[in-house]
């Protein structure tokens, strides 16, 4: 029986406005249309997060800021986000779904020039991503797709939890050593870049 095509309820999930034109164009592996659309939208959201993190890399590589370990940390997280987006696209394809290629807007983080606002931006993005994954998992359950619910929870939501905790710890330590939001805590940023274990471990890989 075909899935009813009513309006979507209010949701925080990224809405792929162009996706409905493609629905029904491929053989689905019991993939509900609303879940397919949401997987498509969430994949784009993850790519946007990867681009934001990549923009932060370039900021901390600038000569007037030059925090190489901080830049390396953001680079590693950007690569992880890109891999996550590709994994979700692979899952979407395996289930017979289709991704609608979209133009991703330039990240609006040019004004970020210090460690604390960069970490706060990253933390906000990950918290939003976590909330979206929770809703996507629940949506999948509600539409009788327990497989998608399980995959989202285990492969995409679960790994975010320790990463959010890590960022919270980094922010606490950054404030403790004197980092500020306006680059006036330059020595604190130097200490974070040189001594923070999570950052030095990244730079040695």
Set out the residue ranges of the language-model regions.
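Iron-associated oxidoreductase/ferritin-like identity signal
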Residues: 1-205
């Amino acid at each position: 029986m075909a899935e009813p095509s009513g309006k979507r309820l209010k949701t925080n999930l990224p809405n792929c406005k162009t996706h409905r034109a493609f629905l029904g164009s491929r053989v689905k592996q019991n993939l509900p249309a609303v879940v397919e659309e949401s997987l498509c939208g969430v994949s784009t959201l993850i790519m946007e997060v990867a681009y934001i993190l990549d923009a932060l890399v370039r900021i901390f590589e600038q000569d007037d800021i030059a925090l190489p370990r901080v830049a390396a940390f953001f680079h590693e997280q950007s690569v992880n986000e890109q891999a996550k987006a590709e994994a979700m696209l692979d899952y979407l394809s395996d289930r017979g779904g289709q991704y609608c290629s979209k133009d991703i807007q330039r990240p609006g983080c040019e004004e970020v020039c210090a460690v604390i606002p960069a970490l706060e931006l990253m933390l906000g993005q990950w918290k939003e991503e976590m909330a979206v994954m929770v809703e996507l998992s629940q949506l999948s359950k509600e539409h009788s797709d327990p497989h998608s619910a399980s995959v989202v929870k285990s492969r995409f939501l679960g790994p975010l939890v320790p990463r959010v905790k890590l960022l919270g710890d980094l922010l606490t330590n950054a404030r403790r050593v004197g980092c500020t939001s306006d680059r006036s805590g330059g020595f604190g940023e130097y200490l974070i870049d040189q001594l923070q274990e999570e950052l030095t471990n990244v730079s040695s890989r």
